[in-house]
C-alpha cells in the first residue's frame, strides 16, 4: 500500500473532471473524484464515508477489484500516461479507517422489517449492508464456516489477507 505522502501525491494527480468517466466505469458508482478530493485535503474520515456511501467492502475492493479494467481505464490521464490509481487510494483510506477506528455508516430508523439473506459472500454482505442502512433487521445464513464466500475460500491469502475480510465483515 501507499504511505500517506504517496497517497496524497497520487490523489493530487486527479483532475476532478466535471463529468468523471471513472465513476461511470465503477460497477457501484463510487463518487471517485469526491473521495480523492477528501484525500488531498487530508479529510480521511470524510473520504472513507464517501466510499462507504456506495461500497460496503472498500478494503476488499481496494485490493481485488479490477480497477484497471473498470474505473481506471476511463481516467482521462490514461490517454497521455498513467491513470490515477483509484484502487490503491481506496485501499489507503480503508486501511486508514482500520487503523483509526471503524465508522458505522448512518442508518435509517428501524422499519420493523426483518430480511433473511442466504449466502454471506460479497453479494450477500453488500445486500445486508444496504438493507441495514435502510433500517431493516438482517439475518445472514451461510453454509460454510465463515462469512465472505469467495473472498475467504477462493482468493489466496497473499492477494487478499483473511484478516482484511474479517474486519470488513465484522464492521
Language model features with spans:
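Ferredoxin-type iron-sulfur electron-transfer modules and their immediate structural context
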Residues: 1-114, 162
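Conserved beta-strand elements of the Class I
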Residues: 116-118
